[in-house]
């Protein structure tokens, strides 16, 4: 029922609309007949309602289409009019202007043509068939001809510059290709060596150091190899310097450049001083084997810690700190004073070594020989002790053992300073008797003897190293220690004849320098050395082992005896000046 009712309502509305349309059509056809006399022969009452509806709808669409098309055409025409207004003005312009307006027209058109020429050069003005515009064409042609002439000239210049650039680039490429051939540069012309700013700065620093001071410092740290300077290297003007600035390298450059004008003996002097500093204060003690040059026989162990020299006070001439000054820090006194530097005494190796260097030396020795303490200690080495001695190692640790050790050290400092004064007086006496140079034959003989007795020399080195670490508590052990000192100094100092003159009577003297003294010993050598060491020395070593058991480092007890008074230093300097 709902569907039928909806369709019925539609049909009713369509019939009503068609009835109205019929009325309108009939009215329109009657109007055409009466007014215009047109008879179309249409009778709207005969056609059904749906035909009238469809016809009217089609006519309405057609009218809408026509209206839209007309509107679009009108809009397009309006746009075209907006785009081209000057053409209409030219078309609407009067064909024959009056003669009064010619001047104004000329001015206006000349301005317009100038503007056009600026904007569009290739366009030609339109004369419009006028005879008056002839001079204007001439005026316009002149700037065009000028610009046309200028344009080809600039083009030619640009082409030439481009060609030149191309040629230069091609030449540069050819040169680069030839230089890159096989990765080798072509050797043509004179090569110039360019010095960088960094090298110039380093050279200025070297020159400044040469003018300010002319002597080496007492120690050259960081160098472990023996340096020998030949006469050819000394005569050269400059030495190659690496990129890194090492302290030792700068000292070497200073020392070598000071002896540029020297002779052959100056080369011996430089090499011997360098060898001495390296073997005494450098890192050479930590190496297993140190090769000494033949020039070391003339040099002395003059930079030994002063405390160790003070222990051997009964025989001051046997320990060769005094003989180390005979050559005055390794200097050759046969040279002229003009060849020397004025302030050569500053920073020399004969001055007392600071506590830091001696402590480092002691720690190096103890680090390389850890088994000596176990062998010489009282608790572990009872079998190696002297059976004739009265002393025995305590079974328990004493609480006040370290304090007694320090008190004995403080008491032993007072006689040491007096004995060092006596050694300085003997030093002045012995300096005049020693000769300045030795022959090569004696050196060779000493080398041969030293090779035969290298084993005894190793044991003596061991004795000296351990004796420097241990404090002296009793006066009974001093004579035997002094004998051991004399044996040690004979191995590293001048020939035996000089030492016999300066020392108190010693029965046996072992031969001098060993060619290659080894610092670190094997276990077999350490066993042999323990049997060859004097018994009293072993006795004095036992308190030291107990002190180590009480966790007291050796540097604390040793550093107290390393200090020297300024009076002793002044006396040593006076002795050097007098010689």
Curated annotation (Swiss-Prot):
Region feature Interaction with BCCIP, mapped onto this chain: 72-168
Region (Activation of NF-kappa-B): 1-71
UniProt modified residues of type Phosphoserine: 179, 215, 250, 297, 303, 308, 341, 366, 412, 423, 454, 475, 491, 493, 565
InterPro entries in the record: LYRIC, TransReg_TumorExp
N6-acetyllysine found at: 263
Bias kind Polar residues: ranges: 317-329, 351-369, 380-391, 410-420, 517-533, 546-565
Bilayer disposition of the protein: Single-pass membrane protein
GO MF annotation terms: double-stranded RNA binding; NF-kappaB binding; transcription coactivator activity
Lung-homing for mammary tumors: annotated segments: 378-440
Comp. bias (Basic and acidic residues): 108-126, 421-431, 449-470
Name recorded for this polypeptide: Protein LYRIC
Organism annotation: Mus musculus
